[in-house]
Amino acid sequence: MLPIRVRKELQRLGLDLQSQSLIPQTGLSGAEVYRVGNYAIKSHPLASFDRLAILHRQQQRWAQCVQGWIPRLQAWPSLLSSPAPTVLVAELDAPLLQRPAADSLYSCWECMDWLPGIHSETIQEVTPGQQTSVAHALGTLHALAQQAPSPPNGSRDDRMTERNRLLQELLQSNFQQPYRDLDRLATQPIPLDLLDSIPNTLRSAKQIALDCHRAMLKLASQNNTRHWMHGDAWRGNWLFDADGVSGLIDFSQADLRWPGFDLARALGSMIQGPMQAWIDPWESYCQALSDRGLQPAFRLDEAYVMHRVSSVLTLARYLGEHHLFVAPNSPSINRLREVCQQLIDR
């Protein structure tokens, strides 16, 4: 349920709270989002207040420069004169006996445009036109970010450093933990064809890790180019109208990062096959930057390496999180199947 304070703010915006849209809609990421009229209402932990305020300023800048497919944030009526008018802190509206611990009595709430369109649930549903449209949209987003003030020289992307560390640990241990996790995973209700494919997938993942670890080490140690990016540009966060992009949602992972992450995350979740299949979208990405007098801050092969490394690490993580597969129809089963297919089709 929406907290009382959030309800009052929405009423002040003239929204009807009696509609069925107050039922939370669970996205592919697991986050609950309420649709009220033409707005999306989403909660965050109280501890994320300062970060949300920073993210909102960047998202507002993108929304002002890109009309239509970046959701605009709505200022809460009672906060119009505050430094962070788009971040509302509200106490949870729950019976006393059902209340959580004191440190989670409050949460942050944001209100933004509800964008139209549909998303692709599987990689097979994505069309070549959608792949190209997404790449062009990312190029537009990154061009705007490059034109913003740069972070201090010598800064590093912690996400890249962490991926490199995890990859090196897998190689040094000869993938021992994933193989042990596979034995325990056999007790979960996973389709037999998928379970039988995992040993072959692990062999392929190990070879990919061996092939990519030097390139990954170089990226982690030498690349210090960072600018604002979406941070989780996988296919579930893109909305489409036919082949065109109609929306990019969920900016909660936006940050100053190496920009190749966005393209790796997006195309890696939309294209199955070798790097050659990425060339047309890559050219569209480059064109969006060129239209603004800019060039990519990374090479296509670097983004592809990041995708391959991320796929290996995703497989290892999924094998170790057995709770994701306790339900026979868990979405994680489809995600595991997709990762296995990507690692085998190399």
Which sequence ranges carry the predicted segments?
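A cross-family kinase active-site recognition segment
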Residues: 124-199, 226
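A conserved alpha-helical element in kinase catalytic cores
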Residues: 43-107, 123-133
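Active-site activation/catalytic loop segments of kinase-like enzymes and analogous catalytic loops
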Residues: 259-293, 308-327
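Protein kinase-like catalytic domain
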Residues: 63, 142-149, 271, 289, ...
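All-alpha amphipathic helical-bundle segments outside canonical DNA-binding/catalytic cores
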Residues: 294-307
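Active-site acidic catalytic loop and adjacent metal/ATP-binding pocket
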Residues: 26-37, 41, 210-261
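A glycine-centered beta->alpha junction motif in the catalytic cores
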Residues: 105, 109-124, 187, 309-327
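Juxta-kinase regulatory segment immediately upstream of eukaryotic protein kinase catalytic domains
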Residues: 1-19
